[in-house]
Amino acid sequence: MTNKTILVTGGAGYIGSHVVRQLGEAGENVVVLDDLSTGFRQAVLHGELVVGNTGDAECLAKLFARFDIDTVMHFAAHTVVPESVANPLKYYGNNTCASRTLLEHALKAGVQHVVFSSTAAVYGIPADGEASEDTPTAPINAYGTSKLMTEWMLRDVAAVNPLRYVALRYFNVAGSDPGGRIGQSTPKATLLTKVACEVVVGTRPYVSIFGTDYPTPDGTGVRDYIHVEDLADAHLKALAYLRRGGESTTLNCGYGRGYSVRELLAMVEHVAGHPINKREEPRRAGDPPTLVARAARIRAALGWQPQHDDLAKIVTTSLEWERKLAAGHWRS
């Protein structure tokens, strides 16, 4: 730990807020930059919240002048795959161009470390459905491409500047803070676990199964679900790695185990204790049939040891959070 400040962009959002909470619990100095378009003021449990956009050069200049920032954790982004297919320029503008502006100001301020929120969507459709960090990148939607372009920027900038980074490629994030303080609260979210749990508590009429004819055992898409608590811990481990002098690197964040849509929904029904309304729909644009992590490298590089690798635990914490939201116990 240092006396410097960590800037967390998008720190009022789902994943960012869990990282901010863990940073605060570790005694780190934190400032959050979030425009609150999908984040929530009350989700920021530690540090100061500055309301602003990552692509706003004037806002960034003031922020870097005010705080002694040596690390940036960059989460701020649009993340909805179907929307990125329908409106790609929105994603290139907010995800890629805004990241360029952020990097420019970070370099001017002498930032030494960046931990970047990337995505497994950069892999597109791997030949066998599994992806290691050496799997060729071939995104099939603008969301994945916008994140990959930011990875390229980081790579090229770090090659000629005293800045090192870790890019973490997330697989499917789910679950919520076991303490019940924060969780996925975005209205009209598309994350399957959240949608299914909303059906359980009655805030959504049904959950859609997009595609039942994939080349998978039960015909539905297969994904690697990672608990948000373990993902947040990976960011703290990445920061510790960089502080030890670790070289810039890119790492998968997943458990290395896949569950189909039907398997996940069966677990939701098991935890809820009753069936939920489901609707079979055509495939959704930009969705690969199977995407599972090969995740040995992150464990070796960072010493990361997941503590929540349990689908029942992921679903249980998700459902507990949705019940809290439905009861009105967490308001914006």
Where are these regions (language model features)?
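Active-site/binding-pocket entry motifs
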Residues: 56, 174-176, 206, 215-216
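Glycine-centered small-residue hotspots that permit tight backbone geometry or close packing
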Residues: 11, 39-41, 52, 82, ...
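Short-chain dehydrogenase/reductase
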Residues: 92, 140-148, 182-194, 224-225
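A short acidic, helix-capping loop that chelates divalent metal ions and anchors anionic groups
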Residues: 81-84, 176-182, 217-219
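Oxidoreductase cofactor-interface core, primarily capturing Rossmann-like NAD(P)-dependent enzymes
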Residues: 163, 178-179, 205-209
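C-terminal substrate-binding subdomain of Rossmann-fold SDR/epimerase-dehydratase oxidoreductases
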Residues: 193-195, 201-332
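N-terminal Rossmann-like NAD(P)+-binding domain of SDR-like oxidoreductases, especially those catalyzing
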Residues: 1-173
